[in-house]
Amino acid sequence: HEAAGERINGRVLVDGSGVGTYLRHLVPLSRQAIGLDIEFPRVQESHAFAELVVCGAGEHLPFPTGSIDVIFSHEVLEHVQDDQATVQEMVRVLRPGGRIVLFCPNRGYPFETHGIYWRGKYHFGNIPLVNYLPRRLRDKLAPHVRVYTRADLARLFAGLPVQVVTKRTIFGAYDNIIERHPRLGKALRAVLQALEKTPLQRMGLSHFWVIEKTA
């Protein structure tokens, strides 16, 4: 809400809306909350929260140029086929002054949270140190998902009519740990969120960027 400002009251797009978690919170705040997801079963599910949810890909947004006030993209960019085209499309559909609120995986995080492929078999879980390997080897182990440095993100937005309003690296909420071990989870979250105010934020789970369209 804070990142979007008064724009939250306009037309809001959740790019990668999944089962509708964000839509549920945005519908009461906005003039129109729109969902987009590439998986049709998820589109059907999220219709429970918003009237307009479309099945489509981030590389080809089915919206007019300059028609959206805010775009939320939460841990989606790393999964699309073409992240450059996806970024360009988000910027295209934004109105001047509109904002993208973007979360995506940080290469500095000590774990690969999407699992890896090893000897042709997928291994689920948080795999340590994978993201610290040379890019070619890292991408061979995790070809199904990208990670980003700040420089990687800057290159994606280079040459586009935007300015970066917020550029941070954050740790997670660790809700799963809190659910199983409340005291430990809350203590861990407090410590890691305190690190967000130090140089160690570079080891955070995700990039949190707010990007504003300038023209």
Model-inferred region functions:
Residues 81-89, 99-210:
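S-adenosyl-L-methionine-dependent methyltransferase catalytic module, highlighting the catalytic core
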Residues 1-113, 208-213:
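Conserved SAM-binding loop
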